[in-house]
Amino acid sequence: MEQTVLVPPGPDSFNFFTRESLAAIERRIAEEKAKNPKPDKKDDDENGPKPNSDLEAGKNLPFIYGDIPPEMVSEPLEDLDPYYINKKTFIVLNKGKAIFRFSATSALYILTPFNPLRKIAIKILVHSLFSMLIMCTILTNCVFMTMSNPPDWTKNVEYTFTGIYTFESLIKIIARGFCLEDFTFLRDPWNWLDFTVITFAYVTEFVDLGNVSALRTFRVLRALKTISVIPGLKTIVGALIQSVKKLSDVMILTVFCLSVFALIGLQLFMGNLRNKCIQWPPTNASLEEHSIEKNITVNYNGTLINETVFEFDWKSYIQDSRYHYFLEGFLDALLCGNSSDAGQCPEGYMCVKAGRNPNYGYTSFDTFSWAFLSLFRLMTQDFWENLYQLTLRAAGKTYMIFFVLVIFLGSFYLINLILAVVAMAYEEQNQATLEEAEQKEAEFQQMIEQLKKQQEAAQQAATATASEHSREPSAAGRLSDSSSEASKLSSKSAKERRNRRKKRKQKEQSGGEEKDEDEFQKSESEDSIRRKGFRFSIEGNRLTYEKRYSSPHQSLLSIRGSLFSPRRNSRTSLFSFRGRAKDVGSENDFADDEHSTFEDNESRRDSLFVPRRHGERRNSNLSQTSRSSRMLAVFPANGKMHSTVDCNGVVSLVGGPSVPTSPVGQLLPEVIIDKPATDDNGTTTETEMRKRRSSSFHVSMDFLEDPSQRQRAMSIASILTNTVEELEESRQKCPPCWYKFSNIFLIWDCSPYWLKVKHVVNLVVMDPFVDLAITICIVLNTLFMAMEHYPMTDHFNNVLTVGNLVFTGIFTAEMFLKIIAMDPYYYFQEGWNIFDGFIVTLSLVELGLANVEGLSVLRSFRLLRVFKLAKSWPTLNMLIKIIGNSVGALGNLTLVLAIIVFIFAVVGMQLFGKSYKDCVCKIASDCQLPRWHMNDFFHSFLIVFRVLCGEWIETMWDCMEVAGQAMCLTVFMMVMVIGNLVVLNLFLALLLSSFSADNLAATDDDNEMNNLQIAVDRMHKGVAYVKRKIYEFIQQSFIRKQKILDEIKPLDDLNNKKDSCMSNHTAEIGKDLDYLKDVNGTTSGIGTGSSVEKYIIDESDYMSFINNPSLTVTVPIAVGESDFENLNTEDFSSESDLEESKEKLNESSSSSEGSTVDIGAPVEEQPVVEPEETLEPEACFTEGCVQRFKCCQINVEEGRGKQWWNLRRTCFRIVEHNWFETFIVFMILLSSGALAFEDIYIDQRKTIKTMLEYADKVFTYIFILEMLLKWVAYGYQTYFTNAWCWLDFLIVDVSLVSLTANALGYSELGAIKSLRTLRALRPLRALSRFEGMRVVVNALLGAIPSIMNVLLVCLIFWLIFSIMGVNLFAGKFYHCINTTTGDRFDIEDVNNHTDCLKLIERNETARWKNVKVNFDNVGFGYLSLLQVATFKGWMDIMYAAVDSRNVELQPKYEESLYMYLYFVIFIIFGSFFTLNLFIGVIIDNFNQQKKKFGGQDIFMTEEQKKYYNAMKKLGSKKPQKPIPRPGNKFQGMVFDFVTRQVFDISIMILICLNMVTMMVETDDQSEYVTTILSRINLVFIVLFTGECVLKLISLRHYYFTIGWNIFDFVVVILSIVGMFLAELIEKYFVSPTLFRVIRLARIGRILRLIKGAKGIRTLLFALMMSLPALFNIGLLLFLVMFIYAIFGMSNFAYVKREVGIDDMFNFETFGNSMICLFQITTSAGWDGLLAPILNSKPPDCDPNKVNPGSSVKGDCGNPSVGIFFFVSYIIISFLVVVNMYIAVILENFSVATEESAEPLSEDDFEMFYEVWEKFDPDATQFMEFEKLSQFAAALEPPLNLPQPNKLQLIAMDLPMVSGDRIHCLDILFAFTKRVLGESGEMDALRIQMEERFMASNPSKVSYQPITTTLKRKQEEVSAVIIQRAYRRHLLKRTVKQASFTYNKNKIKGGANLLIKEDMIIDRINENSITEKTDLTMSTAACPPSYDRVTKPIVEKHEQEGKDEKAKGK
């Protein structure tokens, strides 16, 4: 941060780069080299200085540097970045202030930076026109590339392009140098692209390389150059590359999972898809054809005779496709299988494996690669229903399980993981950008502080002199006046302005006293305010300022925070930077240019000079005469502008008056700029305005009574007008003359009469009721447009036409009236009005051109009116905003996507275009190009777009068939992976991030009400008033209810008092001011008068206040502190606020923040009881019932009442008993199961039918009994207030009704039959019984409101497309077909309907038919759009649309080709946006619900939460007892070998190799290969058996304590058995090879050992964590499928078999229904299942067809039921369940990522315990201190402590128990602490771990630590010190003693003395030696117990002390 401040910013920081500069740099480099000759590279990179990110090449120069002096533009300058101070670089700045950085070394060894040629090259390079030229060239080039057969002259154009690119590269190379230094040509990866493109251009030109088209495709890469030219794109591409890097782990995991699944598929289905139905026995003709002559020699009675025998050739017969069974309209023969549940062959055919695989032979499981492709297709869910149906038909229905696993684990999980990863990458990048921006902001603040200090210092003297002359009006003013005086950035104009002001001030100081106040006021307002260029930001990011007065850097300096925050204030901004509670509006609300820079937030907000203001801001009658104040009134305030104007166009001033500082002028009380509600368009009546204004402030009376003050206040209007004019001018985008023009012509205020008219019009048009009426008109108009259909009667058509005219008239009138009321100038200042104007104009144009052909499209523009609803519909508004936002953010992304699509489209066209033309007969029987080909650019584009939609497999088959497999696979996979996965997911990530909880919750800004709400509100008030009057009238007639009247009266009194006391103290505040609005519009007013006595609500009414909307409660607030200032509006925005306020009242809390008066507490506080399981029944009836019907009240103390009570208690006990509940659940399951038997065959199975009928009765009686018991036990009140009970009740009712009907013999009635189908709802009762499902359902119900809201918005959105579709295609899909072949007649034969009718008259084979799913009316339009949005059945609709010509005309092939675009646009907006919006809403909703539930997962029950938490922290593991090492020597050796890691890894490698050999298997391999593989397999079996045996030997019976071992054992046994009994097992069971695949799961164990696999571990961990929740969702999905299956069986069992319904996939039996429904869960193939159900009358179906074995007649479907069935199922399963899946996975993925990002993960703890086992074999949980050092070294990072580590361990202060042992938790904890560092969290973690440990180890040895390692060390050291001191003391004593003895014995003989002396010296030496050894021992920190005795240390020291003493003596 400091670096940026080093170079003083400002214009004088630029210096030319000269030879001297270069010499200086070289000198600096030399100095540095001399200083440190060997720089340590690594260290330098880490901590060294980094380049400044703001001064990177390519970025724009930060404005802090000011303007570049003109002579320095495009010239070499010294580098500004301090990082490059000793690097040979220089920079060049162009006019646009972009930075270019060059190397200062010689380019190409010859051109120095000062060479004129290089200088010219640099000038060209940095010029903006140069990049423009290149850009245009690239775009033109792209246009030429899209030509499929370019004419000859394009060759020259090619040369031109190549020439321009060569010129560009040469310029770059000359300017930059080629490749050696930094910043040279090849150092930029984007230039590599250029280089290769140019090289290829020359190579292909001069060298003949054969296949040119492949090389020509390289030219396409030029399109990528656009990315390098447009700056914003580079960042997006950066983001893409980032997300791809992040995806690497997911990709590995995906490939791994797919491989495993592919292997399983290979083993299960190898060769199955080649089973065909072959005609058998063969006919005579075929016998002859396939017989071969063979000459054989027969020994006939010993004579050899040559005979010719005809032998049947079986092989050639089965390969001949003529004898295969084909269904009509299918390319491939019908598949079949030999198992009982597989597809069966028709009569006369048998099932044989022959011929090729389906789909040109590309769909199969015959080899690993094809199986992998099939699984990839399954994962991406493209046309997977086809694969599913083929496989089930060939292998059997049981294999549905395989698909369920793949779809749920593979598809949903992996695809969503990709989404999660991309979203997180995006999120991280956003976070980084934000942090960077905040850091910049901080740096900027710092710079400003610095400047400020410098300037203040420079100003000190000047200020001193100035202050003698003039007293400044405000401190703030003085500060800022001086502050920018000496600023480098201060521009000339600003200085002039200051001088002018100074002169003026001096003048005023001298002569101002005599001047009249008002006149001064005028000069102040006119001059000073006018001249200070008001800065003001629009949408927080366009910083505009007055050009005439200030230069850019001057005013930019004054923008305090908003510099780096584009979109800071827009509500929809993805991330808010820093919430400022007080600033509602734009950053610098009214801040003056110079007054806002250096004050802090608070003072800045008061910095506008204006006198105090009058209470009423403007008087309505004055307003019409003074132009300026009117301008103030209607200054538009749309949502985008953070202006000072509230929603009525009135400046709102909030805050009390400030005390005048001097008579000269005073501060305007803080001006808050209210950001008006986006939905408001300034249309509010005068009274509403006044009301709102009055609610904005509260001024004391004495202030207004002072005449001079009032006089001055009157001029406020003019001043504010000036302010507003300033604001206007500050936003000027056009030259002033335009403004002059608009003032004259566009603001109409010529005559007073006109103004009166205008006033009246204003009153009318701006009234909320008018708004309401207009909204109703919009809705009606939409309805009218939606009523168009085909065929329509003339009368109906006329009604619609007239209606359209009327509505057009109404909207036109509205527009003109608004223009009159607002003046054109202001009318068009607002977005909504422009929108209205646009639509009205279009409608008028369309009326004029109504009869012109081809312009009917204009009618579609009328649909945009629907969007006007957004004004008053917040969610729609939000959706549009999110789309707008995303499109803003997506602008660049869309460009990248467009470039990718373009490149691939061109590549496809260049590579495959010719092949499609040449080999077309391979894929089309009539040798015409199919609809999907790549022969021209448009079709190629469509194919790429289709791939992006996720449909790639079918077009890829065609491509592979015509152009070869390898190329097609590569291209399609690239489009798929790059385009689909990455870009679409980035798209999703953007959508998700533009969603944030507050978007949905608080859609209304600032609690503003829009006019619609006001109008509705008024109506509510009116109704409430009428109600109350009637109520009072009734009450007067019934005195019985006098009590209620008494309640209401004081309330009314309070209201009246409120008004009177209020108006006494404030300047005109609206009378009908409401604070708390009830839902029903009744208000709880808030009284203000200290005289008002508390109104105490008694308890019952206290509750009824909440429940009874017509009871108003007044809550007094003391006058002085009412919260008026803070309330801008009188209404709460949404019911949620209301709920909150209700809750507040409910809690009897104070009603106003500062209020001294509370709501009276209820007389008795109701104790809130937790609803525990009470053992007594509750009351039978509600209190209301008991009051009305006295008979309901029973005395339960005596007589019959008591018996009744006892009965109830008995029932209660029964119902509450666990067994009762279990029994009922069992019954529910049984009865649901019984429903599954009622299929198509029920009539044939008489016994089952009879049983079911009886069972049904029994179940019904049981359920009725249960219901009665519950009624008696719980009482009606409890029973009927529980939603689950209601569900039970209704379902029992259905059974009861159908039972009764059966008994009475009405069972065949239609109504009863349909009622019987409702029995399918029975399983729903299971919901409330299973907690897992109930949890999910509750979560879903919580999400329903917002899901419905979005659903509605999507419906509106789709409505537009649907109506447009009706306009474009209604009646045009009819076509004439030949009923025998089913083909369409050619347009030559049949041109229109009449031709077709003629054909029908002549012969019967023709038919004029419509496509089943069409656009004939809006309803069908919706259905068609749903098919397009789910990409199922959309082809037929698109083909019909593309072929359509006109109503009643026969369609023609690709007649209106560009109708494809309608679908493309719909897919982008209708499908991508809206469907992804669902995902957004659901995820968002669940996050909100999680917050509500305290952050717990809402899909899990308590039990599962426990499992989840256990998974989350395995810290709860206890040290396990390891398997003891066997005593036997041989066994011991084997044990050591088996338990080594190497052994595990080698086994792992063997498993992988085994997999590889399995992958090599193919279906048609030779005998030789088969034998080799079986031998290899044998080897593996031997090896695995060996492993098994070894482990058994070494581990003994412990072998079976480990799950994996048991699994291995089983696999080995099966393999051995399988070798001998292979045929037998395969016949009855699954092939045993399958189990080997499952062994791959063992890889999971190895992942822990691989360091690099951390990411994959995280992903698997996320999956493990998601499992419980996913299981619940799966359960719910199963329940939904079950119910729908039963329903489908009862409704669609007999429909005609066609399209998607056939002998295997139908609704005839329960199993088949489930198979179909599972397929539709991913919305696959639902169009095929729906099509037969749409047949409702002949000739499509036969209503009288007899179904054998059943009484039901006909095979027609019921279209309405069918559509409802499928659409509801798709919405429930696809949108809800699948998206819940996504939500769970995203959630857990982020949790898992956070976990893995933590320094310590589960694995580390696990590893700790694994190592622990080796050191503590008996699992005592303790370890001796001396082992600790080795243990710490044996751990793996991050926990390990490499040796030597003794001192560190001692310093850890570990608690020890007797025997010098330390507990494992203490060690783990200390190590953890070392990794994480000290923090408050550590203590929490410690407690948590201990609790967990205690819980998981009840056997935990309770221990009391005696000491700690540190204490022990301290004790040792102290002991040593004591010893030393004592020895020293001893020595002294000895010496003393010796000398004494010596002196004493001096007299005695000398020999004796010598002996003594020796003794003393010995004694001294001895002492010092022990001291030395002691020292070494302690410093080496040997294990403290020297004698290795585990005695407590104290004893030991005592003992040692005694020894010493003994020695001493």
UniProtKB/Swiss-Prot annotation:
Outcome, altering R393H: In DRVT and ICEGTC; results in a non-functional channel
Consequence when changing T199R: In DRVT; borderline phenotype with spike wave activity
Impact reported for I1771F: In DRVT; borderline phenotype; also found in a patient with focal epilepsy
Region: S3b-S4 loop of repeat IV, residue numbers: 1619-1636
Residue spans that sit within the membrane without traversing it, per the record: 370-384, 939-952, 1416-1433, 1712-1726
Outcome of swapping A1320V: In DRVT; borderline phenotype
Alphabetized GO MF terms: voltage-gated monoatomic ion channel activity involved in regulation of presynaptic membrane potential; voltage-gated sodium channel activity
Residues of the IQ domain: 1915-1944
UniProt keyword annotations, A-Z: Autism, Autism spectrum disorder, Cell membrane, Disease variant, Disulfide bond, Epilepsy, Glycoprotein, Ion channel, Ion transport, Membrane, Phosphoprotein, Repeat, Sodium, Sodium channel, Sodium transport, Transmembrane, Transmembrane helix, Transport, Voltage-gated channel
Mutation effect (Y1462H): In DRVT and ICEGTC; borderline DRVT phenotype
Consequence the record notes for mutating R865G: In DRVT; results in impaired channel fast inactivation and significantly increased persistent current
Leader sequence segment: none
Disease entry from the Swiss-Prot or TrEMBL record: Generalized epilepsy with febrile seizures plus 2: A rare autosomal dominant, familial condition with incomplete penetrance and large intrafamilial variability. Patients display febrile seizures persisting sometimes beyond the age of 6 years and/or a variety of afebrile seizure types. This disease combines febrile seizures, generalized seizures often precipitated by fever at age 6 years or more, and partial seizures, with a variable degree of severity. Dravet syndrome: A severe form of epileptic encephalopathy characterized by generalized tonic, clonic, and tonic-clonic seizures that are initially induced by fever and begin during the first year of life. Later, patients also manifest other seizure types, including absence, myoclonic, and simple and complex partial seizures. Psychomotor development delay is observed around the second year of life. Some patients manifest a borderline disease phenotype and do not necessarily fulfill all diagnostic criteria for core DRVT.
Name of the molecule in the record: Sodium channel protein type 1 subunit alpha
Species name: Homo sapiens
Gene encoding the protein: SCN1A
